[in-house]
């Protein structure tokens, strides 16, 4: 039986009553499987003797003789003090609320003492101690070179109020005794042997009741590997289900593609008619990585088509390959991911299909729609913009055109998968900033194009795009069932953004540096963590607000320049007008909140000032910085932080100061925040790890992934 299949309630264990079971339930522990899967967070090694004389270096664990008692305080506040010695020093055990110890540890008895000792009032004392009697009497000198009989490695579990380590350990021991020997391995035996792992039952014993610290380490190594192996196995099977191949096949192809020489001529020859038109109209060259990514995605779009559905006849045919593209396109800020996605949309249009481009905000959706209309409209592609704010008459006509197939590419927000939105032939769903959408929302847009015929169900091709690079370990876990295309190279002519750190109180220096850029005809952003002083009750009132600073900057600092204020509560029509004014250069300074994190592309803007930068996340700061550096001029980012910045905050800002490489920043973000907070993985609904840590165990992850895929490949051949 697998551990996860043991559904016996904790209350069913001997000695576990309703009140104890209720305490366990507060920790999410309801069954024996939950209990045995709650691993110790640490261990206390009581196998080594640490005498009183070494109290400064470690927690004391020694055998002492009780030499007397004292009491201090009055009435209910009266407290027992027990005098002890282990032959190396004298000490006092301060027994708050434990008067019964006078009887259980009588004078002259030998006791095993474990605790943290400090010097206080001229005495060596401990108030947080364990003391167990081992003999009624005896010579302390006989124990100088011996450890106490209760010596052991004790697991330290996470607890909830009212639940003690003693009760937790006892309950785990009962569960192991009753169910431990019947637990089966979940990893294939050949891999257990090859990787020199423990069996599952042995690993559970060693992790919960280790005889030595090395046993505990061995058990944890096995359980970490097992967790990652099973996760990768699940991802591989999911990939097999929706694309017909295991991840290893795709990775091998990607590696071959990456190392092959994809020339500009070979790339051009692979393009569909409308793709070729766009390629020839571009006023700049695509980067190597853009061409490679488009080439990879084209191959998958072609694969998902049936041979009877060629570009020549553009006939939509339900008898398509049952497997569809499931790909993540990642790249740094400003690397050209959107243009690559437009190329793929054109291939789908050439096949006679429709595309839906989903963005999390109206601002970003509008930018995509404007760019698509500008670049794809002249090619005869019908592009539409759809959000919840579209007026009823126009909306009705738009929805009708979508349903009849008169629209090729629709770009918008959540309205794309609303109940009243229907497509004639949705073939590609592009999901930008995929981490901003939950699993159910992604499924909703895909479901709009899912069709069935006979035994096959065809699902639209899916292209997800990330705003910033995905850490490698997340790419192998959360996105382990996807093919991944990566754009590392930036467009030619871009200069690396120079980033400077400044502490609050020295803003004037930053403002002066920005003034020089404004005098040169450039533009600037100023970003703040809140809208106004009254914007949110739970926000720190000491934080500057966008509204307050707009007034200050426009009246006091830059009265000669035109400033605009944009935030999340700005009306859509007004926001569009303000942003258009900034884009065309009429407005010199844009004061904003993080609403400008995405969806604003102004090549002439060269300064990004972020005040209270320590209040923003690393990925968020990198994304904001990416609003500048989009032209050929040198750009600057100024991060102004508070004087009470935390150590983590300092590390975050240092990472930005030291590099503009989004891939390095993504890895640093993973270290600082953990996988659960990076790239929306909590929202994605995929990642729940119990003992493994992606930042710490990334090499184990790679090994487990390869093992899982290789084993499944062998099973396929059999």
Would you name each region that the model predicts?
Residues 1-12, 231:
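Long, highly charged, low-complexity intrinsically disordered interaction regions
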Residues 308, 323-654, 714-717:
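Inter-lobe coupling/hinge segments of SF2-like helicase ATPases
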Residues 56-76, 115:
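Structural detector for short beta-strands of small beta-barrel domains
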Residues 72-258, 262-280:
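Upstream accessory/linker segments immediately N-terminal to the RecA-like ATPase cores of bacterial MutS
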Residues 632, 645-718:
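C-terminal accessory region of SF2 helicases/translocases
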Residues 284-304:
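N-terminal pre-P-loop "Q-motif" helix
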Residues 41-58:
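Short boundary/loop segments of OB/S1/cold-shock single-stranded nucleic-acid-binding domains
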């Amino acid at each position: 039986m697998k551990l996860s299949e043991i559904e016996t309630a904790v209350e069913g264990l001997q000695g576990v009553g309703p009140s104890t079971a209720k305490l366990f339930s507060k920790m999410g522990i309801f069954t024996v499987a939950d209990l045995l899967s709650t691993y110790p967070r640490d261990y206390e090694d009581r196998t080594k003797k640490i005498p009183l004389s070494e109290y400064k270096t470690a927690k004391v664990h020694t055998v002492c003789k009780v030499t007397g008692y004292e009491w201090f305080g009055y009435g209910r506040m009266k407290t027992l003090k027990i005098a002890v010695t282990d032959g190396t020093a004298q000490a006092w055990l301060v027994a708050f609320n434990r008067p019964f110890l006078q009887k259980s540890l009588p004078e002259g008895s030998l006791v095993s003492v474990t605790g943290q000792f400090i010097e206080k009032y001229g005495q060596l004392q401990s108030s947080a101690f364990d003391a167990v009697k081992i003999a009624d009497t005896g010579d302390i000198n006989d124990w100088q070179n011996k450890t106490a009989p209760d010596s052991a490695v004790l697991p330290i579990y996470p607890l909830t109020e009212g639940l003690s380590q003693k009760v937790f350990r006892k309950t785990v021991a009962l569960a192991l005794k009753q169910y431990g020997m019947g637990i089966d391995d979940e990893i294939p035996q050949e891999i257990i042997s090859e990787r020199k792992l423990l069996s599952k039952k042995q690993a559970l014993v060693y992790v919960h009741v280790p005889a030595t610290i090395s046993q505990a380490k061995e058990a944890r190594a096995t359980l970490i590997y097992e967790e990652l192996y099973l996760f990768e196995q699940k991802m591989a099977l999911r990939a097999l289900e929706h694309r017909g191949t295991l991840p290893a096949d795709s990775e091998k192809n990607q590696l071959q593609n990456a190392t092959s020489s994809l020339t500009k001529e070979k790339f051009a020859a692979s393009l569909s008619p409308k793709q070729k038109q766009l390629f020839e109209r571009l006023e700049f060259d695509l980067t190597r990585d853009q061409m490679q990514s488009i080439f990879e995605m084209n191959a998958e779009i072609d694969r998902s088509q049936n041979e009877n559905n060629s570009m020549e006849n553009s006939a939509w045919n339900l008898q398509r390959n049952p497997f569809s593209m499931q790909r993540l396109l990642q790249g740094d800020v400003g690397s050209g991911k959107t243009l690559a996605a437009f190329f793929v949309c054109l291939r789908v249009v050439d096949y006679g299909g429709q595309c839906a481009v989903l963005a999390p905000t109206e601002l970003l959706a509008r930018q995509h729609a404007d760019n698509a209309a500008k670049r794809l409209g002249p090619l005869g592609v019908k592009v539409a913009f759809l959000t919840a704010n579209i007026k009823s008459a126009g909306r009705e006509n738009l929805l009708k055109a979508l349903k009849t197939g008169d629209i090729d590419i629709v770009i918008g927000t959540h309205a794309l998968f609303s109940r009243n939105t229907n497509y004639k032939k949705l073939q590609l769903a592009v999901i930008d900033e995929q981490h901003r959408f939950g699993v159910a929302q992604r499924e909703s847009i895909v479901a709009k194009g899912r069709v069935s015929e006979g035994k096959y169900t065809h699902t639209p091709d899916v292209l997800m795009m990330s705003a910033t690079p995905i850490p490698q370990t997340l790419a192998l876990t959360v996105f382990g069932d996807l093919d991944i295309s990566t754009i590392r190279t930036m467009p030619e002519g871009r200069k690396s953004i120079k980033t400077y750190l400044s502490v609050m109180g020295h803003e004037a220096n930053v403002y002066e540096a920005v003034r020089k850029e404004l005098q040169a005809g450039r533009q600037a952003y100023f970003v703040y963590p809140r809208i106004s002083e009254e914007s949110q009750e739970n926000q720190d009132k000491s934080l500057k607000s966008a509204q307050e600073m707009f007034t200050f900057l426009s009246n006091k600092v830059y009265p000669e320049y035109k400033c605009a204020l944009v935030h999340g509560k700005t009306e859509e029509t007004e926001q569009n007008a303000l942003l258009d004014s900034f884009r065309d250069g009429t407005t010199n300074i844009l004061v904003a909140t993080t609403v400008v994190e995405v969806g604003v592309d102004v090549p002439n803007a060269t300064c990004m000032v972020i005040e209270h930068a320590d209040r923003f996340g690393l990925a968020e700061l990198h994304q904001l910085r990416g609003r500048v550096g989009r032209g050929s001029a040198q750009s600057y980012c100024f991060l102004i932080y508070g004087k009470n910045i935390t150590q983590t905050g300092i590390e975050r800002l240092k990472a930005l100061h030291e590099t503009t490489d989004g891939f390095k920043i993504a890895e640093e973000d993973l270290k600082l925040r953990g996988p659960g907070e990076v790239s929306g993985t909590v929202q994605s609904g995929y990642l729940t790890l119990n003992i493994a840590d992606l930042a710490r165990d990334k090499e184990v992850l790679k090994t487990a992934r390869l093992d899982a895929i290789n084993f499944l490949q062998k099973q396929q051949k059999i």
